């Protein structure tokens, strides 16, 4: 039969063809098409023949065509045909479809919908035909039956799409359907249906099928709905990531059916999807714009949804497109800073923590992106690198005193900018570790910034470089040429940068001979440079090389393991590859350094400070270094035993014209000798063993040094100040050459005395004679110190009370203090009595300890041996703290003999030292605070590290200082020590930071602090301020301080009286600390300051309320509950704050800072009330919410308890200023011209103090304006509680007004409203602050 149809079709006889086809039943027709298709012969020709004999003009023809279409769809989807045959059949059917009438198209389209609903599609090939059918249907103008009514083609198509998107889809056909919809013209609404349906299908598909589906969706988004597509994709992968994380946290998942896919598979799929989206953005820039716009909007509502690891990765991949890079980085940096600020605000307030417990941390998300990028996400890495550097450059470390960047050592500050910088460094370091291809680029950029930003501190970049080198020292061999290029610029860099850079790349020097040789060449050239900085850089470099290239046989004991920062990497394989070469190399460097001993003092100083470390790390150089030092000191040592003084001081200075300079830092030289000799004797000499051949030579210089130091000690004790030409009559003026010379001499002599004190104490072995020598040396030191202080005092120098930087080492200071105050050994008693007999010496010892701790706190390191070794510094701090703590608690200040009241008492110095130590510990050793507190508790020395309860240990220390403070507060007025009380309060504040705010100890401490403030009528302003600041800092971590503020405000009101003198105030007192002396300005300003902080918290909450109010997501119930909780919290806070201000505005505050601060705080309060009212206006617009009763009460409270009182307070302020002006005028009349300046000053002060008044009135009126708006929206009359006042920021003087009007008849009446602002509430531009009034001249 098929052959006959083909033949008839070829003959071109339509009648016969139609007749033949009419004779076939539906089944026969189908079988014929199937047989022909399976044989693969002339299928298209057969179909064409059938269509030719089935004209659309005849009903039978249309019916037959439909039968063929239905059968072909089934045939194609059966999977029995070859792909080529399928394409041929579908192509022909698509061509013929446009000829079908509307009702046939409708029937065919309905068939497809049913097929899809049944899930009968196997390969989706027939869907190409479906798209053509729907397109043709949409163009049909024919009325089509649908249900009981009729629709046109377009409407019918819309109903079909709606039905299709509402029905169940077979997951296997989703991609085909998404592809099909691209070819159909869709309205915006239809497209939204389709996109939402496809997105809902994501969760039902196998993960591997997601990328091609995303690709189809992105192509489909060319029609529109870009935001929906992007939002759906991001949300899907965000949920997958969360589920994956949850499963990692709880690996034994009970619900095995919903176990997520393997991590690596998920990451690879995410990476592919990101690439698809980036490719789409490259083709259509609007998708990128829509992505940024969507994430910005979402970030305002829910940062956790907007900035998840997937979306951040997508943004960073997109940022490679330069047009969007700036927008993306600005958005990410803003988000990071905002996240840091929000966390900072939350951590400071228990009230906020309770209301908003879960807070999003964007930094953790970005670091997770770095971790995820390890799964082959090369497209993300460049964005990560750019973001990392952008964050680091947005912040520069501050320079501390002396120009050295302090951030390296001082730990991370809480500032958001610094946290952002730290995040940038973490991003770069982790990216460096994960992605090998980009390592050279990161290294290149870091080195470039170290060089080009040398004028500003680059410590954060050097720290990053250090960490990079530590993570992969061998990797740098590939970049050695770049490092070598950097060395060429060493001469032009500041010395701090040079030292940091060399320490950072030091591991590379051990594994790369070429880099080491390049550095040596650069350093040898620099050592002869004209520039002082270049020579210092050379010395720093050579010392580093000497420390790190050990000669075989050098000691490797623990005492030689001084850290030089985190960059220390031991490459032992290379360290001793050629010990002979190392020795020659080191001796050559020493030869170069010897030449530096004839250069400026700064260069010599670096050498003297560096030799000790070299000696400890490279002990085989001991002989060479000791010989060098011996020959150097001999130039200044006078061997004749009867000559005084024993050293040639004149050789230490150099004159250039009228200027005098220090040429040889003799005290530093002697200090270096003392430390090197002590180390040599205690270490090398004891380890010599069988090496007798060198022993004689070594004993020679050792004996020389000992004899020399012994002689210098003896003669220094004998020497009088006149021997140094430094008696009291000497000139110490810094403006004259003689004065400068004498100052240099004095500092050198004092330094030499200190060096000898340390030397003799160490070798004395508790000998009475030696300790007498120590005291003799101190006497010499002290005389000079007193003279310098006296001279500095006469010159009104700020350095008058500061001792010169001490030459004692930190280790020795801890030993000396322990001996003076804690050594109870009977054998030491007689010798120590010598030192203990001198109160001045003991005070000096504590003063030096204080100075050392201060230096450590400010610079992160101290002078002298081990000054840069964090471990040794920590141990020394623990020892010093134990001694100072014992000394302070054992001997109260009141019973201490303060030595003719000269200088601070030892107890007070101990207290200052303890405060600095506690601060330093929290800054530099935060991670080691448990060990520190354990070291102070001698009763629990053996506790395991894991068992240390920081809160308990800190509470124990706090109790000691509480007792001392109570003793101070209960002492007689004459015995009260204000300075000591302030220090105790500050120490308690510092230690309180170690308490867990949720602990019982914290609550006990807070209760105690409240009690102290309530029961002690303290009149010392500084102590009062300290106690209240402590109280507030504790209270905010326990609960909101508003009720506390109210009680304090009531006390201030009671103390200062009412603005209405006829009003009697109930004499009740909550806090005795609030009294006539402290109430204003001290307590008042503290209360206002704390109220401002509460207002800032409320403002932050209102912003979150606004964000929650604009969230229209499905999870509206949770948002609604959160909104109600926030609204309740805000209204309660504001309600109590209104009662605080209600008290203060009725208080007769003195003119000045209190009035000014109160007026400004009131303006803020009304501005925040206005923000709250705006929030409710917005809520009324978006929902049918009514005004809650709480808000109504708040408005009523503001209308009854605040606004009227504000106007009364304004009148009061104007009255007190009028009185002060009148008083000044009277004085002017009496003394005429002499007092003109006084009047001008008073007038300026009045103008300054009354400046906030117009702003306050404007804020009140803005509040009332928006209350009117809310009343209209909510149908609740809120204005019934507000009494409009005619009192504004002026008072009309009728007589003056008349005279002015007579004088200025010609003046336009428009100026009059400027003088009468009673109608300000109806200004044309409501958001503009009122203009300043013009002052008329009389």
Curated annotation (Swiss-Prot):
Post-translational modification note: Monoubiquitinated by FANCL during S phase and upon genotoxic stress. Deubiquitinated by USP1 as cells enter G2/M, or once DNA repair is completed. Monoubiquitination requires the FANCA-FANCB-FANCC-FANCE-FANCF-FANCG-FANCM complex. Ubiquitination is required for binding to chromatin, DNA repair, and normal cell cycle progression. Monoubiquitination is stimulated by DNA-binding. Phosphorylated in response to DNA damage by ATM and/or ATR. Phosphorylation of FANCI promotes ubiquitination of FANCD2, which prevents DNA release from the FANCI-FANCD2 complex.
Subunit (UniProt): Homodimer. Part of a FANCI-FANCD2 heterodimeric complex that binds and scans dsDNA for DNA damage. Interacts with FANCL. Interacts with MTMR15/FAN1. Interacts with POLN. Interacts with UBL5; the interaction promotes FANCI homodimerization.
Residues carrying Phosphoserine: 558, 561
Record key words, sorted: Isopeptide bond, Phosphoprotein, Ubl conjugation
Lineage: Eukaryota, Metazoa, Chordata, Craniata, Vertebrata
Protein name per its UniProtKB record: Fanconi anemia group I protein
Effect upon mutating residue 558 to D: Phosphomimetic mutation that promotes ubiquitination on FANCD2
Gene Ontology cellular component terms for the protein in this record: nucleoplasm
Residue positions where Phosphothreonine is found in the record: 567
Cross-link (Glycyl lysine isopeptide (Lys-Gly) (interchain with G-Cter in ubiquitin)): 525
Family: Belongs to the Fanconi anemia group I protein family.
GO biological process, one term: DNA repair
Organism this protein belongs to: Gallus gallus
A Pfam family reported for this protein in Swiss-Prot or TrEMBL: FANCI_HD1
Top-level taxonomic group: Eukaryota
UniProt effect for mutating residue 561 to D: Phosphomimetic mutation that promotes ubiquitination on FANCD2
């Amino acid at each position: 039969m098929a052959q006959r149809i083909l033949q008839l079709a070829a003959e071109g006889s339509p009648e016969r063809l139609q007749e033949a086809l009419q004779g076939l039943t539906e089944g026969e027709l189908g079988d014929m098409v199937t047989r022909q298709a399976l044989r693969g012969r002339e299928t298209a020709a057969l179909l064409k023949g059938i269509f030719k004999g089935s004209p659309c003009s005849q009903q039978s023809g249309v019916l037959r065509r439909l039968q063929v279409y239905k059968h072909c769809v089934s045939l194609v989807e059966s999977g029995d045909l070859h792909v080529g045959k399928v394409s041929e059949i579908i192509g022909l059917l698509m061509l013929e479809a446009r000829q079908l009438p509307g009702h046939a198209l409708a029937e065919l389209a309905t068939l497809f919908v049913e097929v899809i609903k049944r899930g009968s599609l196997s390969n989706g090939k027939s869907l190409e035909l479906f798209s053509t059918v729907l397109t043709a249907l949409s163009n049909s103008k024919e009325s089509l039956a649908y249900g009981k009514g009729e629709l046109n083609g377009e409407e019918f198509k819309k109903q079909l799409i709606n039905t299709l998107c509402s029905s169940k889809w077979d997951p296997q056909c989703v991609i085909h359907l998404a592809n099909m919809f691209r070819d159909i013209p869709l309205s915006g609404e239809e497209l939204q249906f389709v996109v939402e349906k496809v997105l809902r299908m994501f969760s039902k598909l196998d993960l591997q099928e997601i990328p091609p589906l995303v690709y189809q969706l992105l192509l489909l988004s060319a029609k529109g709905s870009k935001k929906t597509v992007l939002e759906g994709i991001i949300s899907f992968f965000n949920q997958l990531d969360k589920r994956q994380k949850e499963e990692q946290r709880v690996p034994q998942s009970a619900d095995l059916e919903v176990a997520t896919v393997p991590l690596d598979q998920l990451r690879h799929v995410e990476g592919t999807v990101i690439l698809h989206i980036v490719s789409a953005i490259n083709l259509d820039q609007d998708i990128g714009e829509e992505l940024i716009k969507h994430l910005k909007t979402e970030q305002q509502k829910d940062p956790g949804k907007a900035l998840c690891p997937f979306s951040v990765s997508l943004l960073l991949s997109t940022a490679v497109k330069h047009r969007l890079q700036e927008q993306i980085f600005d958005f990410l940096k803003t988000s990071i800073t905002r996240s840091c600020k929000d966390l900072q605000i939350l951590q400071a307030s228990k009230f906020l923590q309770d209301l908003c417990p879960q807070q999003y941390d964007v930094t953790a998300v970005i670091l997770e992106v770095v971790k995820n990028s390890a799964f082959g996400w090369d497209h993300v890495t460049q964005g990560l690198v750019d973001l990392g550097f952008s964050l680091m450059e947005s912040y520069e470390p501050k320079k501390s005193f002396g120009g050295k960047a302090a951030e390296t050592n001082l730990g991370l500050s809480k500032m958001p900018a610094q946290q952002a910088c730290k995040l940038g460094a973490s991003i770069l370091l982790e990216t460096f570790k994960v992605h090998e291809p980009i390592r050279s680029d990161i290294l290149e950029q870091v080195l470039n910034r170290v060089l080009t930003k040398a004028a500003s501190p680059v410590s954060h970049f050097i720290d990053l470089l250090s960490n990079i080198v530590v993570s992969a020292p061998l990797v740098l061999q590939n970049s050695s040429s770049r490092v070598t290029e950097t060395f060429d610029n060493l001469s032009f860099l500041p010395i701090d940068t040079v030292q940091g850079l060399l320490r950072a790349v030091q591991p590379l020097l051990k594994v790369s001979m070429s880099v080491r040789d390049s550095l040596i060449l650069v350093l040898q050239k620099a050592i002869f440079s004209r520039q002082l900085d270049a020579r210092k850089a050379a010395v720093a470099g050579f010392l580093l090389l000497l420390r790190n290239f050990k000669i075989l046989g050098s000691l490797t004991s623990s005492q030689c393991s001084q850290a030089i920062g985190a960059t220390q990497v031991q490459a032992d394989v290379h360290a001793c590859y050629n010990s002979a070469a190392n020795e020659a190399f080191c001796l050559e460097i020493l030869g170069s350094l010897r030449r530096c001993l004839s250069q400026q003092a700064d260069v010599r100083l670096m050498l003297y400070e560096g030799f000790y470390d070299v000696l400890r790390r490279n002990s085989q150089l001991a002989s060479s270094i000791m010989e060098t030092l011996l020959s150097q000191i001999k130039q200044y040592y006078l061997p004749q035993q009867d000559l005084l003084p024993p050293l040639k001081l004149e050789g230490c200075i150099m004159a250039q014209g009228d200027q005098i300079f220090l040429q040889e830092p003799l005290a530093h030289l002697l200090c270096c000798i003392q430390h090197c000799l002590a180390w040599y004797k205690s270490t090398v000499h004891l380890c010599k063993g069988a090496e007798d051949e060198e022993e004689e030579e070594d004993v020679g210089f050792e004996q020389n040094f000992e004899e020399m130091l012994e002689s210098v000690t003896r003669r220094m004790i004998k020497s009088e100040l006149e021997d140094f030409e430094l008696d009291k009559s000497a000139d110490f003026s810094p403006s004259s050459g003689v004065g400068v010379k004498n100052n240099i001499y004095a500092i050198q002599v004092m330094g030499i005395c200190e060096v000898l004190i340390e030397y003799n104490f160490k070798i004395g072995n508790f000998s009475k004679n030696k300790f007498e020598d120590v005291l003799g040396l101190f006497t010499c030191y002290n005389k000079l110190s007193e003279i310098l202080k006296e001279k500095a005092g006469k010159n009104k120098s700020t350095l008058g009370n500061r001792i010169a930087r001490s030459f004692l080492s930190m280790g020795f200071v801890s030993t000396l203090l322990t001996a003076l105050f804690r050594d109870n050994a009977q054998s030491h008693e007689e010798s120590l009595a010598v030192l203990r007999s001198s109160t001045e010496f003991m005070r000096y010892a504590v003063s030096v300890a204080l100075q050392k701790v201060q230096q450590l706190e400010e610079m992160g390191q101290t002078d002298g041996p081990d000054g840069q070794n964090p471990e040794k510094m920590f141990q020394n701090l623990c020892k010093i703290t134990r001694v100072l703590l014992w000394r302070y608690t054992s001997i109260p200040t009141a019973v201490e003999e303060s030595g003719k009241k000269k200088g601070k008492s030892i107890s007070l110095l101990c207290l200052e030292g303890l405060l600095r130590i506690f601060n330093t510990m929290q800054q530099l050793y935060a991670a080691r605070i448990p060990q520190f507190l354990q070291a102070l508790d001698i009763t629990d020395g053996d506790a395991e590290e894991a068992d240390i309860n920081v809160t308990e240990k800190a509470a124990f220390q706090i109790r000691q200082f509480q007792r001392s403070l109570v003793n101070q507060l209960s002492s007689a007025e004459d015995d009260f020590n204000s300075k000591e009380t302030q220090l105790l309060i500050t120490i308690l504040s510092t230690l309180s930071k170690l308490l867990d705010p949720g602990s019982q100890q914290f609550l006990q401490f807070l209760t105690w602090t409240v009690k102290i403030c309530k029961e002690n009528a303290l009149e010392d302003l500084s102590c009062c301020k300290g106690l209240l600041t402590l109280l507030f800092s504790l209270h905010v971590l326990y609960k909101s301080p508003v009720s506390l503020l109210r009680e304090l405000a009531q006390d201030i009101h009671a103390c200062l009286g009412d603005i209405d003198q006829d009003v009697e105030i109930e004499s009740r007192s909550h806090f005795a600390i609030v009294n006539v002396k402290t109430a204003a300005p001290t307590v008042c300003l503290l209360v206002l300051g704390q109220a401002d902080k509460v207002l800032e918290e409320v403002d932050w909450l209102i912003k979150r309320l606004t964000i929650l109010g604009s969230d229209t997501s499905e999870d509206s119930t949770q948002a609604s509950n959160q909104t109600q909780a926030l609204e309740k919290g805000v209204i309660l806070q504001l309600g109590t704050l209104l009662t605080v201000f209600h008290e203060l505005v009725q208080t007769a505050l003195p003119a000045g800072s209190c009035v000014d601060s109160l007026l400004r705080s009131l303006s803020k309060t009304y501005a925040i009330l206005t923000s709250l009212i705006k929030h409710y206006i917005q809520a009324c617009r978006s929902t049918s919410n009514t005004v809650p009763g709480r808000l109504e009460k708040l408005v009523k409270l503001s209308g009854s308890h605040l606004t009227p009182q504000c106007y009364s307070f304004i009148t009061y302020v104007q009255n007190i200023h009028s009185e002060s002006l009148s008083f000044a005028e009277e004085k002017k009349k009496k003394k005429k011209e002499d007092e003109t300046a006084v009047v001008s000053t008073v007038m300026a002060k009045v103008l300054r103090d009354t400046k906030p008044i117009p702003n306050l009135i404007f804020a009140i009126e803005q509040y009332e304006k928006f209350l009117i708006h809310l009343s209209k929206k909510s149908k609740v009359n809120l204005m019934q509680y507000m009494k409009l006042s005619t009192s504004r920021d002026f008072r009309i003087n009728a007589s003056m007004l008349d005279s002015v009007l007579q004088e200025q008849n010609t003046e336009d009446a428009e100026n009059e409203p400027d003088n009468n602002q009673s109608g300000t509430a109806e200004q044309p531009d409501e958001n503009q602050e009122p203009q300043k009034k013009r002052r008329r001249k009389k």
